[in-house]
């Protein structure tokens, strides 16, 4: 095996060019076995094998600096830069993260996981190189839908003025996570169709030199192209036409499904753990499709992640023009929603919590200042969500709950969520965001009759005394568990409250609690600093009421175990009861 002898890029250069396809197959074989057992980003890495080999064959990493956009396609890069055991040995699968990580290797320059940042980051590396009078190539690798992000275009616009070495590899696999959208990708398609020769060329229009490689999975063709641009004294774009999922038939056929995979059977491609249970994604899709049938003003919006709302390809076709994918452009999605709402439409925007930070300015400026009645639903904003440091869902409460005019809601069950949607999609007075609970969806079959238009009215679900536990969203179930344990262990009949609202206080209820309670406990699925519980504590201020806030510490966690994090933050019923009894 060639791969077994690769301990760094210098070993790649020792292999004859006509033998490199054999190593490419070895890389795919290793990726296939690992993915079948461990899961991970699949299609992006299978499509980038030859390009990665060619990069390390031609350039001198780490002197020549390679920056991968999103870096979800960096598995072959890691295999060629001293980390192959993490892909060859099951015992070492967890030795590396799913993204580039400077703590792992000198060949990784940034910890990244969000799209469209590579050109700007690499431009910074190039600018610093020039200021210090150094040499060396700087390469940004971007594609897989990332060009649709505003920062990518901003970076291209700025980079044209550098007038020094800067190489941008555009990995064009004709896909984002799902299909591509927008005029930019029409131009890429035209460039592919004309072998890069059409006069209508986005990159040339921006003043950039341009090279096209039609055989983007031909390592010899790539090496030839990269050698031509190596040590260039100005910015050049190398546009490579690749096949997402190349080398594994199911992934080539169903590119969207195989963007990311869990463990699967190699022979059939079928997942080992096929989750057919109803979840918030499927519930959302079913709700919106039904609403669309009777109301042409309803619009579902995604920013490149349609299945987060349950909109698989067939569901998107069913929705027709009432489903909009703006590409990986969260800012545009929010501003678009505001415009639709102002002109009488009923926009619904679904987004992962980790990507909410990219929307902050538009939520504040374009939506909330204008009081546009959009509905924005936040997925995986939870300790139970994605656990990579680049994709944490802990920060949406402090971010969104402090924007004026926004009503931010937190259901605990399917029924509460649907009731909130019924209200939000029809009301025209407020921008509304809904934070979905983490973990498996809970459905209790109850009929929710609450009028959410009467803002900031909490619900007392169990009346007690001395101790009141306010459990927000995900942790409403934990509030009930802690109350039950308090009764069993100390005979304390605690009050349990479902607050529903993240953005406002039920001051009448909180004041009433002073009559026969001495301690209020708040539980929230997010960072405590600037969060929900702090607002409760501030309300009680100088009163005699003790307030105990439970949530997460302000820190970046990476590949964490959810149960361990909960215990570390005393977010178990046993720990909460122990804490309460220690101060009683």
What residue ranges belong to the model's regions?
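Cofactor-binding active-site loop characterized by glycine-rich and histidine/acidic residues
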Residues: 41-162, 298, 303, 312-313, ...
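Glycine/charged-rich beta-loop-alpha catalytic/anionic-binding loops adjacent to active sites
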Residues: 29-36, 95-111, 133-139, 312-327, ...
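Active-site nucleophile and cofactor-binding loops and adjacent substrate-binding regions
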Residues: 39-48, 67-72, 101-120, 142-146, ...
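Peripheral docking tails and interdomain loops at the edges
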Residues: 263, 271-274, 385-387, 398, ...
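N-terminal amphipathic, basic-rich helices that act as targeting or association modules
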Residues: 1-79, 215
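A glycine-rich helix N-cap at a beta->alpha junction
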Residues: 86-96, 161-175, 368-380
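Glycine-rich ThDP/TPP pyrophosphate-binding loop and its adjacent helix/strand module
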Residues: 108-264, 270-277, 282-284, 406-517
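Non-catalytic terminal/interface segments that mediate subunit docking, oligomerization
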Residues: 248-357, 362-372, 470-473
């Amino acid at each position: 095996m060639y791969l077994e002898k690769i301990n760094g890029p210098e070993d790649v250069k020792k292999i004859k060019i006509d033998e490199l396809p054999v190593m490419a197959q070895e890389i795919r074989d290793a990726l296939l076995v690992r993915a079948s057992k461990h899961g991970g980003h699949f299609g992006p890495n299978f499509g980038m094998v030859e390009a990665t080999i060619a990069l390390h064959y031609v350039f001198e990493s780490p002197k020549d600096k390679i920056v991968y956009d999103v870096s979800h396609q960096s598995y072959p890069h890691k295999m060629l830069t001293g980390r192959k055991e993490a892909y060859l040995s099951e015992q070492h699968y967890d030795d590396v993260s799913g993204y580039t990580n400077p703590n792992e290797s000198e060949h990784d320059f940034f910890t990244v996981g969000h799209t469209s940042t590579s050109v700007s980051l690499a431009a910074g590396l190039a600018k610093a190189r020039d200021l210090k009078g150094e040499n060396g190539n700087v390469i940004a690798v971007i594609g897989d839908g990332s060009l649709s992000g505003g920062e990518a275009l901003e970076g291209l616009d700025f980079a044209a003025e550098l007038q020094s070495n800067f190489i941008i590899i555009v990995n064009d696999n004709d896909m984002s996570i799902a299909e591509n959208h927008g005029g930019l990708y029409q131009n890429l398609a035209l460039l592919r169709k004309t072998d890069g020769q059409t006069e209508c060329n986005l990159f040339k229009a921006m003043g950039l030199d341009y090279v096209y490689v039609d055989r983007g999975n031909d390592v010899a063709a790539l090496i030839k192209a990269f050698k031509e641009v190596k040590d260039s004294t100005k910015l050049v774009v190398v546009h490579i036409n690749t096949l997402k999922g190349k080398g594994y038939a199911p992934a080539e056929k169903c590119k969207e499904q195989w963007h990311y995979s869990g463990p699967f059977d190699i022979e059939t491609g079928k997942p080992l753990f096929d989750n057919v249970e109803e979840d918030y994604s499927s519930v959302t899709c079913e709700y919106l499709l039904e609403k669309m049938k009777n109301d042409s003003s309803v619009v579902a919006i995604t920013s490149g992640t349609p299945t987060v709302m349950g909109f698989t390809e067939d569901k998107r076709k069913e929705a027709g023009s009432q489903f909009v994918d703006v590409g990986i452009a969260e800012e545009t999605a929010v501003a678009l929603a505001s415009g639709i709402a102002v002109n009488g439409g009923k926009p619904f925007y679904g987004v992962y919590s980790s990507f909410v930070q990219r929307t902050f300015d538009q939520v504040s400026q374009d939506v909330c200042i204008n009081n546009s009645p959009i509905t924005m639903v936040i997925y995986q904003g939870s300790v139970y969500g994605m656990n990579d440091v680049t994709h944490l869902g802990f920060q949406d409460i402090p971010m969104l709950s402090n924007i004026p005019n926004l009503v931010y809601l937190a259901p605990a069950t399917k029924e509460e969520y649907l009731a909130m949607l019924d209200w939000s999609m029809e009301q025209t007075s407020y921008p509304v965001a809904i934070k979905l609970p983490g973990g498996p969806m809970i459905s209790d079959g109850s009929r929710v009759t609450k009028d959410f238009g009467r803002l900031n009215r909490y619900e007392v679900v169990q009346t007690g005394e001395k101790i009141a536990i306010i459990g927000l969203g995900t942790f409403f179930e934990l509030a009930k568990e802690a109350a039950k344990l308090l009764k069993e262990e100390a005979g304390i009949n605690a009050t349990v409250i479902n607050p529903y609202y993240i953005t406002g206080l039920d001051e009448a209820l909180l004041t009433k609690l002073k009559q026969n309670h001495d301690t209020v406990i708040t539980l929230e699925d997010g960072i405590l600093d600037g969060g929900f519980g702090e607002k409760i504590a501030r309300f009680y201020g100088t009163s005699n009421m003790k307030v105990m806030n439970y949530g997460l510490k302000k820190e970046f966690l990476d590949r964490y175990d959810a149960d361990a994090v909960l215990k570390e933050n005393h977010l178990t019923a046993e720990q909460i009861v122990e804490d309460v009894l220690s101060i009683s």
